[in-house]
Amino acid sequence: MDVRDQKSVDAGIRRIVDRFGKIDIVVNNAGISGVTPVDAADTDAWLDIVQTNVVGTYYVTRAATPHLPNGGRVIMISSVLGKFGVPGYTAYCTAKTGLIGFTRSLALELAPRKITVNAICPGWTDTEMARDGMRDIAAAAGISVEQFKKEAMSRVPLGEMVDPSEVAALVAFLCAPTGDKITGQALSICAGSTQA
């Protein structure tokens, strides 16, 4: 499904419900990034990042929540860039900050149904999107990707990237019965790059 297209999302959610009868967990993980400095950003690229990351998440969540049972789970994959700014990434930071606000408000809306809503905020994570971002930043700085990665990791207290399996483990924890009292939170998994 194309999360930027409400009709596509609605049809996708209908297919899931037709096949499984309900939806227990929603993990909003669709997202894109890109360099978007305000003074040089392509407006279409800027809006595409916000449309995919925020509006797409809204479409999926809106279509899925009526099918969640009491005690269901909604998880947003945000970013530590939703907690602090980075030059050149205004659209991405804006979108990820928006997801944190959406999480907090939705947690209150769905609390009467005992549905928990949380955001996970990864730092540098060893994914294709992060590797592409490192490449773009390194190119803009006129340095090698290896040099940029070394410099970036020197600012991370634990000195390494997060593995996607570690993010998945946090999702699983929040979806387990042990996560039923955690809601409205923006949980960082970032090797210490932020303490917010």
Q: Whereabouts are the PLM-identified features?
A:
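Substrate-binding pocket helix/loop in short-chain dehydrogenase/reductase
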Residues: 37-38, 42-50, 152
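Active-site loop-to-helix junction immediately N-terminal to the catalytic Tyr of the SDR YXXXK motif
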Residues: 41, 85-93, 105, 133
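Short C-terminal tail/terminal secondary-structure segment
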Residues: 84, 160, 172, 183-196
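Short, small/polar-rich loop/turn modules that mediate ligand/substrate recognition or access, typified
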Residues: 111, 116, 182-184
